Amino acid sequence: MAVTKDQTSQIVKKFKTSDLDTGSSEVQIALLTAKINDLTNHFAKHKKDHHGRRGLVTMVNKRRKLLDYLHRKDVKKYQDLIKALDIRK
């Protein structure tokens, strides 16, 4: 199942940097992570969904680019976000 509006609004509230923030790198990365986790669970059941897997790879690449950007701009925010989302081991 896709990420719902309620889940999206909760993620935005948790990771926003200002009151009107919906598009900062942190928020975008958190939303992509939620979608990636959701699709990963989907592929555990639907192994042959190759069209969906292509979308997953696209999301992972976009998240990687945003993480690289955040790492270049602010290492502290990058490290905090990685810990909060539990992305890196």
Swiss-Prot record:
Protein name (Swiss-Prot/TrEMBL): Small ribosomal subunit protein uS15
Gene Ontology molecular function: rRNA binding; structural constituent of ribosome
Listed PROSITE patterns: RIBOSOMAL_S15 (PS00362)
Record organism: Bdellovibrio bacteriovorus (strain ATCC 15356 / DSM 50701 / NCIMB 9529 / HD100)
Subunit field text: Part of the 30S ribosomal subunit. Forms a bridge to the 50S subunit in the 70S ribosome, contacting the 23S rRNA.
Record family assignment: Belongs to the universal ribosomal protein uS15 family.
Lineage of the organism: Bacteria, Pseudomonadati, Bdellovibrionota, Bdellovibrionia, Bdellovibrionales
Entry-linked CDD domains: Ribosomal_S15p_S13e
One BP term from GO: translation
GO CC, one annotated term: cytosolic small ribosomal subunit
Keyword annotations: Ribonucleoprotein, Ribosomal protein, RNA-binding, rRNA-binding
A Pfam family per the record: Ribosomal_S15
Role according to the record: One of the primary rRNA binding proteins, it binds directly to 16S rRNA where it helps nucleate assembly of the platform of the 30S subunit by binding and bridging several RNA helices of the 16S rRNA.
Recorded name of the encoding gene: rpsO
Entries under HAMAP family matching the protein: Ribosomal_uS15_B (MF_01343_B)
